[in-house]
Amino acid sequence: MNTFGTRLKFTSFGESHGVAVGCIIDGMPAGVKFDEEFLQNELDKRKGGSKFATPRKESDKAQVLSGVFEGYTTGHPIAIVVFNENAHSKDYDNLKDLFRPAHADFTYFYKYGIRDHRGGGRSSARESVARVAGGAVAAMLLREFDICVQSGVFGVGTFVSNLKEEEFDFEFAKKSEIFCLDPKLESDFKNEILNARNSKDSVGAAVFTKVSGMLVGLGEVLYDKLDSKLAHALMGVNAVKAVEIGEGINASKMRGSCNNDALKDGKFLSNHSGGILGGISNGENLILKTYFKPTPSIFAKQESIDKFGNNLEFELKGRHDPCVGVRGSVVASAMVRLVLADCLLLNTSANLNNLKNAYGLK
């Protein structure tokens, strides 16, 4: 499916080498101040063009087609489009019938019987432009509640920061070319990425996301738990292979006496849960870690088959990220924002008082 969300519905469209990519956000309340500069800044953060990302240079200028009037949302669908200006489709001519390892080529072809071989079509990281645009719009709603979502890179390849989560430096990450959260490891991260690129290879990365200013009560019970929604959103991002919330995998190694978040004087004394209990936010910071596999597009010689079953050796052309997780940190923030904005809107009907308040009734 290409649509995500319950009350705030986000739909993305477009392919890597098509005319454009974009999104439609339906369900945004009227009267939210629309910050077009912020939208463009978020898209600019996701852009490639540096030696640590894809060399593909796109202006990524957002055009808002609907849903905004005189600087405010109208309550109607918000359509945003970003035109592709720098696709080199000829680089993919030799891949028309070939299945690239670790890509969606094989599965797309056998599911649909047709696939866009130019840059991977819908399975390309280019689709994340739409996610970042949608996440930026969601952030405009979250601002009204002083909810702030921040992400950065805490691991590249075998280099992983040993800083405590509260020590991660988001101010440094804002200035870092690779959104690095640990100033002492930035050079190691960069070297790891460049070494992978220079050896015609790629490398994975780990992204940390913190949400501050959280309210109590976001999320539903059982099948629409906040942690379920967040995992769903993040696992839908290209190249993501794992998501942790709070202690995550660590919790399986702990005892309850250590993992439980005790309360005293109306406050939690720790946050092993990552801000979620019973699928509902408890007001503490949301803590998430997202793990990206190495970019599957590498320039080393590889083996595969074509759609006729022939064995082949090939070398890729084109322009690809040596570490997709770097720009993935921007996408992670976007998806978390979409989830939280959706949950905020769902809460208006969570109980009778909320529903009456929506109509100004007591």
UniProtKB/Swiss-Prot annotation:
Entries under InterPro entries matching the protein: Chorismate_synth, Chorismate_synth_AroC_sf, Chorismate_synthase_CS
Enzyme class: lyase
Biological pathway: Metabolic intermediate biosynthesis; chorismate biosynthesis; chorismate from D-erythrose 4-phosphate and phosphoenolpyruvate: step 7/7
GO molecular function: chorismate synthase activity; FMN binding
Its EC number(s): 4.2.3.5
Binding site for FMN: R122, S123, S124, N238, A239, G278, K293, P294, T295, P296, S297, R319
A Pfam family assignment: Chorismate_synt
Cofactors, names only: FMNH2
Coiled coil: none
CDD domains, per the entry: Chorismate_synthase (cd07304)
Residues engaged in binding NADP(+): R46
Reaction(s) catalysed by this chain's protein: 5-O-(1-carboxyvinyl)-3-phosphoshikimate = chorismate + phosphate
Gene Ontology cellular component terms for the protein in this record: cytosol
One of the GO biological process terms: chorismate biosynthetic process
Cofactor comment text: Reduced FMN (FMNH(2)).
Keywords in alphabetical order: Amino-acid biosynthesis, Aromatic amino acid biosynthesis, FAD, Flavoprotein, FMN, Lyase, NADP
UniProt key word Amino-acid biosynthesis: yes
Gene3D superfamilies, sorted: Chorismate synthase AroC (3.60.150.10)
Subunit structure: Homotetramer.
Protein family (similarity comment): Belongs to the chorismate synthase family.
Function per UniProt: This reaction introduces a second double bond into the aromatic ring system.
Annotated protein name in UniProt: Chorismate synthase
